[in-house]
């Protein structure tokens, strides 16, 4: 599936992943089964975080965790749609991720899949806001935490994206 995604660096050197299309629409709720199906295309792929040179793999657990995690279940409205559509830019979100933070594993259920702990990274993405004429009026920017597990096989796997927060002070107008 063709992805309409680009990475743009601002004057301060901060990178943002621009997703130029809204694949997952809906007045009421996100169809998470469609998002899960979309995410399966990434399974088996891997991407390097430029900031720390870690290779992050996409495991077969990501589509289900991303779409059915406790965090996803509590998302409503714009943040739910933001998470659903951020799926289009996962490779780029990983590549531009910064601010690595390590945390020990604390749950027995993750004793194998996160045997060596968890890493969190900051990333940013922007989604288009369309006018009544169907043209893009502006982009809303969101901060997000990329959650990565360090598996017993020694590899790092993207587990979920969390802490999605719209940046109110910044939207990119389109001329």
Describe the residue ranges of each PLM region:
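Ribonuclease/tRNase effector modules and their secretory precursors
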Residues: 1-175
């Amino acid at each position: 599936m063709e992805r309409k995604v680009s990475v743009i660096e601002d004057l301060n050197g901060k990178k943002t992943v621009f997703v130029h299309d809204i694949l997952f629409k809906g007045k009421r709720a996100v169809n998470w089964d469609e998002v899960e199906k979309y995410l399966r295309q990434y399974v088996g792929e891997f991407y390097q975080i430029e900031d720390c040179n870690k290779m992050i793999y996409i495991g077969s657990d990501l589509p289900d965790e991303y779409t059915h995690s406790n965090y996803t279940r509590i998302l409503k409205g714009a943040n739910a749609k933001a998470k659903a559509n951020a799926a289009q830019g996962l490779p780029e979100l990983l590549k531009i991720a910064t601010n690595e933070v390590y945390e020990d594993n604390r749950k027995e259920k993750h004793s194998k899949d996160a045997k060596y702990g968890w890493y969190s990274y900051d990333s940013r993405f922007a989604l288009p806001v369309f006018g009544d004429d169907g043209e893009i009026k502006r982009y809303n920017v969101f901060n997000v935490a990329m959650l990565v597990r360090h598996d017993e096989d020694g590899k790092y796997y993207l587990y979920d994206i969390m802490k999605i927060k719209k940046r109110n002070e910044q939207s990119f107008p389109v001329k």
